[in-house]
Amino acid sequence: MNILCSRMLLFAWLLPFSALAEPASLAQPTHEFTLSNGLRVVVREDHRAPVVTSQLWFKVGSADEPPGQSGLSHALEHMLFKGSSKLCAGEASSIFDTLGIAQNAFTDKDVTTYYQTLLPHQLGVSFEVLADMMSTAHLRAEDFVPELAVIQAERRLRVDDDFNATAQHHLNSLAYPASSYGAPIIGWMHDLQRMNAAELRDWYQARYAPGNATLVIVGDVTLERVKPLVERYFGVLPAKPFVLTRTALELAEPGERRIILHQPIAAPRLLMAFNVPSLGTAQNQRTVHALTLLSTLLAGSDSSRVRKRLQFGERLFSATTSEYNALFRGDSLFTLDAELHTRQTISLDEAEKRIWQLLDEFKTNPPGAEELERARTQLIAKRLYGRDAIEDQADRLGSFESIGVSWREMDDEVNQLRLVTPEDIQQAAATYFTRQRLSTAHVLVGAQP
């Protein structure tokens, strides 16, 4: 049967809107509304440049996948570009490329997101394409077979052949013994090898519903211009039932876990991960902000304790970093990654003891006013500079909304960071830097014996 393609009236949206922008101000007007079918919409005005980003966030990711079906959400992301009622396979990307619209998509633990950055008068194109993809994707078996081979090749390139990624995947599976966060977003290879198009269609029908999505628009637009477009293209989609997401809760203290890996790398590497709450699970958001600052204080900047003493001072490590991502629906990890200096002869066990000395020091010796203010200034500057790009603004807005936290909390984040005290840092270290919460990976040089 022939498929009619390119039925969209794209030319109608090549004419610019008139009187789009209002004078820019320091405060960014942000609007929200919900369509009758359940689609939530957040619009933030930013009139500094005549561009806009449109992001459609679905509350479905790798954490929602049952055992044996890892990688479903990421595979579905790929397949949404393989044709729908108005589009042939690959035509969405072709349309965007022809119009100079930057576009892509990504899958994470809790979300799948499709986004475009474009001129304001092109928003109708973005909305029509996204609305069609989210409601009438074909998901044919004959399209899935070659695309699955592409996904498997992507996994080999980005995971199996990447020693850093492989080590991180092993650590994640160890660090999340009770929740689905331990599975890789792209999926385990043995699950990919038995995945089929019928599973994708079931996943699509159960998860891709207006009520399970948030549309985020940031840029040179106004609510008066955007809302009619949203209603025109997304408002006609029928409401449909969908599977509610479940928070991926982890055991608070699963017990100490350790793994030893052997890889052909230049120097031994130490990975540590502590089970901690996220913004979606913390009982007190002050804890989240304390952990965020603690990451900067530990090994998140060149003035942090680990880098200043062990990397630059004693030259024990050649590279160190600590990370804490609070933007999850389920529980998170506080991680430390340290690579031994090539001239060092001490073991990773000894290196880990040195790290523990600094971790325990935070419990008895909280940061002084100057140390804390320096870290706070660095972190706040990073947050404020991140607002320069409309894509980054939309990404954080969508992340907050998709984990069940209002975008207003994002706007208040800087104020909350200013309230964190040295005692908050000390309490966070005492609570979460424990061996009962720890997973460790020792990555040794050489082949597996």
PLM features: residue spans?
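N-terminal secretory signal peptides that target proteins for export/translocation
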Residues: 1-5
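Bacterial N-terminal signal peptides
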Residues: 7-19
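Proteolytic maturation boundary segments
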Residues: 18-43, 222-262, 275, 308, ...
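M16 family metallopeptidases and their MPP-like homologs
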Residues: 44, 49-65, 71-75, 89-133, ...
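Active-site SXXK
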Residues: 70-84
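Short, polar/flexible loop-turn hinges at active-site or ligand-entry regions and domain interfaces
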Residues: 82-86, 134-142, 364-367
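Non-catalytic, conformational "gating/processing" segments within enzyme and secreted inhibitor domains
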Residues: 148, 197-233, 437-438
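His/Glu-based metal-binding/catalytic segments typifying zinc-dependent metallopeptidases
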Residues: 173, 242-303
